[in-house]
Amino acid sequence: MKVSLPAFEKARVLVVGDVMLDRYWVGPTGRISPEAPVPVVKINQVEDRPGGAANVALNIATLGGQVQLAGLVGQDDTAHALTLGVQTLGVEPQWLTIADKPTITKLRVLSRNQQLIRLDFEEAFDKADSVRLLKQSEALLDSVDVVVLSDYAKGAIDQPRDFIALARAKGVMVLVDPKGSDFGRYQGASLITPNMSEFEAVVGTVTSEADLLEKARGLLKQHHFDAILVTRSEKGMTLVTANAPELHIPTVAREVYDVTGAGDTVISALATSLAAGADLPQACAIANTAAGVVVGKLGTSTVSRIELIEALALHHGESGFGVVSEDQLAYALEQAKLRGERVVMTNGCFDILHAGHVSYLKQAKALGDRLIVAVNDDASVKRLKGDGRPVNQVDRRMAVLAGLASVDWVVPFSEDTPQRIITRLLPNLLVKGGDYKLEDIAGGAEVIAAGGQVQVLGFEDGISTTAIIQNIMANQ
């Protein structure tokens, strides 16, 4: 499967669920306590990280999505620390404060990268608190495309059926990270993401691949889910939908260091991808890759777009390349330059790709390590070439270009010239075909001012899109 990142900045997501603070006390240990047979840890580092549903929201924000976070907190210093933690990364908290309950806190003591003990500070929230939270969250549905219910069985999400039904009626997808043995609580959800233990707690022991699929499809029918994504640790993920063959995605983790928050990463990457316009198989592949990154980190962690681009390139070869948005390309270009790669850029309409184009692009690629092709969108081609053009729509033109071995990235632009996009990207070498003077090439002055170069390459004589069109018309 070819995997490319959607424009995450377009994603609008609401996360509702059990928010908590993950607190870490870290230090060396060199002796056993005289009071009891336990190690003595000399704490020299204290760190607070948003956890649970808050970690889901942070993952979405780190990927570039717009996210609101609804949850239950106490009237305490921990709630203040949690608020600061999420606001720092642009998450908009929508707390419901319960004065007589503490904000959930999980304190972990670590030494030499090993967790020695975990201490939980929490009290169960009342069912009435959950009802109030979900009712408060209904007002946010009109401003989002996807809702994530992040359930840690702490009381924030007790009976969400009515909330799910309302969201679906408004055209909002609902993704659920489930907890407990009653998946019927989430009836009507678009997608649920149980891990294997959670799945077997509901359906019983899975004895084979066929058994897994049969039981998953049974849940789809019973609870009116659109899809189930079962996360299976070292076996990857299995996506089961009602009307399509199952999809198995193998794990991409290189080294498992800490699985804390891996489920949060999966559902956050799914939500961000789907809200940004990715289809479900693509979103699952992106989520699988994100999970492979996060398990290589210590503690509750997030995955950035840069890390995801690098991981996709590593595990999928062409992933992270091909047809990309301008923002995706800016990130990829930054990483290419950090790796010391020489980036070449050219542009054009490329309406009917012909041998002259192929030869020209091959020459351009030979001048560096990576080649960007910026393509005029349909409206700008029509303005430049007149009625009847383009012959091929921009998505088809870009797909053909992306299939060439010489081309690494293809990006559209809407202006009559590529001046703006070239000025933003600033390649090492800007190439143009034809008989242009260097000073007349759009973006050339800016590239040179930034330390880059501009070069003109020749086209093959007698081959042009216009000539091809005229020949076709003459032979009709």
UniProtKB/Swiss-Prot annotation:
Catalytic activity, EC: 2.7.1.167, 2.7.7.70
InterPro entries linked to this entry: Bifunc_HldE, Carboh/pur_kinase_PfkB_CS, Cyt_trans-like, PfkB_dom, RfaE_dom_I, RfaE_dom_II, Ribokinase-like, Rossmann-like_a/b/a_fold
Listed GO MF terms: ATP binding; heptose 7-phosphate kinase activity; heptose-1-phosphate adenylyltransferase activity; phosphotransferase activity, alcohol group as acceptor
Active site annotation, chain numbering: D264
Pathway where this protein functions: Nucleotide-sugar biosynthesis; ADP-L-glycero-beta-D-manno-heptose biosynthesis; ADP-L-glycero-beta-D-manno-heptose from D-glycero-beta-D-manno-heptose 7-phosphate: step 1/4; Nucleotide-sugar biosynthesis; ADP-L-glycero-beta-D-manno-heptose biosynthesis; ADP-L-glycero-beta-D-manno-heptose from D-glycero-beta-D-manno-heptose 7-phosphate: step 3/4
One GO cellular component term: cytosol
Coiled coil: none
Enzyme class: transferase
Function: Catalyzes the ADP transfer from ATP to D-glycero-beta-D-manno-heptose 1-phosphate, yielding ADP-D-glycero-beta-D-manno-heptose.
Stated family: In the N-terminal section; belongs to the carbohydrate kinase PfkB family.
Subunit structure comment from the entry: Homodimer.
Name this protein carries in UniProt: Bifunctional protein HldE
Lineage of the organism: Bacteria, Pseudomonadati, Pseudomonadota, Gammaproteobacteria, Alteromonadales
Gene that encodes it: hldE
